[in-house]
Amino acid sequence: MSVTGGSKDEILHKPVLLSEALKFLAPKNGGVYVDATFGAGGYTRAILSSVDCFVYAIDRDETVRRFFQVIENDFPKRTNFINGNFVDIGSLLGEVKVDGIVFDLGVSTMQLKVADRGFSFLHEGPLDMRMDRSTLLTAETVVNSYTEVKIASIIYQFGEERMSRKIAHAIVNARRKKRITTTSSLAEIVRSCFPKRYYKIDPATKTFQALRIFINDELGALECGLRTALTMLKVGSRAVVVSFHSLEDRIVKHLFRSVHGNGFNLLTKKIVVPSRDEVRENPSSRSARMRVIEKV
């Protein structure tokens, strides 16, 4: 999930691959759609603006409700916000059958910019990383209380980081001297494990990704939630998924391929990626990948 802009732009932001998503969703008058990862509401607003339809907006982050209220004022009685995790999409929506669902995965730039959420090493903040702040497990708990072996496993499995063991060892050594409580302190510990030279991405990137994915059970939620979502589609309706790293995309690819030809038709034989113009305008979109499947 990638978002650009400041406070005003957050409300009016353009999501990655928006025109492609709308093309595949093909919203119709009277249709019912689901934005399973509402965020700042870019997809919800675009769908509502395209035709006279209804959109269920789901997000586990209660703080995004302020963005929904703006959209609700613009499109009264045409949308409903549900504060919940899309892993529970079946129970959140009940027996509703829908005309299309969009998933825009990962953490948004909007969330990354809020220092006290602890998602980014670019902003000094507490080691939190919870998308749903009503849950208990934080990144601070993981790095200060989990075993070295467990920390290494998390970093390797969810960050695909080859230096995972060295990083875990450095974390455990550092916490013996002082509790690790901030994003900057963790980032410095991770960076100390790498030779001092230029890197295309910050050496701390994969470790922060791994902790965030683990704490929020992002991959487990994706597989379960997406599988349930497919059962909610009407014939001729589509699920559009935008992912931002290989772990997410692998789950989507394998699930879509497993149901292709068995009541579903895979519409994207190859992944859809942003155009050069979009990447130039929004560099954080460069890793986005879209896959689409249709109920037949």
Swiss-Prot record:
InterPro entries referenced in this protein's UniProt entry, alphabetically: RsmH, SAM-dep_MeTrfase_MraW_recog, SAM-dependent_MTases_sf
Keyword annotations of the record: Cytoplasm, Methyltransferase, rRNA processing, S-adenosyl-L-methionine, Transferase
Segments passing through the bilayer: none
Primary location class: cytoplasm
CDD domains, per the entry: AdoMet_MTases (cd02440)
Any one GO BP annotation for this protein: rRNA base methylation
Protein name (record): Ribosomal RNA small subunit methyltransferase H
PANTHER family in UniProt: 12S RRNA N4-METHYLCYTIDINE METHYLTRANSFERASE (PTHR11265:SF0), S-ADENOSYL-METHYLTRANSFERASE MRAW (PTHR11265)
Organism: Neorickettsia sennetsu (strain ATCC VR-367 / Miyayama) (Ehrlichia sennetsu)
Keyword Cell inner membrane: no
Protein family membership: Belongs to the methyltransferase superfamily. RsmH family.
Record's keyword annotation contains DNA repair: no
GO molecular function: rRNA (cytosine-N4-)-methyltransferase activity
EC number: 2.1.1.199
Localization (cell): Cytoplasm
EC main group: transferase
One GO cellular component term noted in the UniProt record for this chain: cytoplasm
Recorded superkingdom: Bacteria
Catalytic activity: cytidine(1402) in 16S rRNA + S-adenosyl-L-methionine = N(4)-methylcytidine(1402) in 16S rRNA + S-adenosyl-L-homocysteine + H(+)
NCBIfam families: 16S rRNA (cytosine(1402)-N(4))-methyltransferase RsmH
Function: Specifically methylates the N4 position of cytidine in position 1402 (C1402) of 16S rRNA.
Residues bound to S-adenosyl-L-methionine: G41, G42, Y43, D59, F86, D104, Q111
